[in-house]
Amino acid sequence: MQVKIESLAAQPLFALRVQGPFAQSLGPGFERLMAWSTRHGLQGQWMALYYDNPREVAPEALRADVALTTATTALPSDGEASGIRWDTLAGGLYALAQVRVIDNDFATPWVALFDQALPASGYRPDGGPCFERYLSDGRASGEWLLELGVPVRKS
């Protein structure tokens, strides 16, 4: 896995909070956000933001946001009633890795990033949510191309 360290600008987005095991909570969350964004004609990049470490937090307590990047700061009128909020992914220094997910196994690239690639980079996590940016839609095939992002600081 190749990791690059980049300074990213803050990214505005529409987000929907989900809680529970990631494999069970993210899909329904994305379906809700996709239906809502389609009703409003919104387009952007799809992301998932992760707030908890699954090695430290019980599966039922894991928090994540499913998100759609946006260029606007205006939340459509039914956003709050739908559980959707306007938010910003903080800018700053991130470790980024482009990975391929096979058979919907999203955990393996994250483990490789945190256990091997990130320590070898000379950087360490700096708090704040990690993210997945979806570069392809693998719903039908189970094969995804995505970018993993972790806020970092020099070790």
Swiss-Prot record:
**Annotated Gene Ontology MF terms?**
DNA topoisomerase type II (double strand cut, ATP-hydrolyzing) inhibitor activity
Q: Where does it localize?
A: Cytoplasm
Q: Would you say which domain of life the source belongs to?
A: Bacteria
Key words, A-Z? Cytoplasm, Stress response
Oligomer status and interactors: Interacts with DNA gyrase.
Q: Which family does it belong to?
A: Belongs to the DNA gyrase inhibitor family.
General function of this protein: Inhibits the supercoiling activity of DNA gyrase. Acts by inhibiting DNA gyrase at an early step, prior to (or at the step of) binding of DNA by the gyrase. It protects cells against toxins that target DNA gyrase, by inhibiting activity of these toxins and reducing the formation of lethal double-strand breaks in the cell.
Protein name as catalogued: DNA gyrase inhibitor
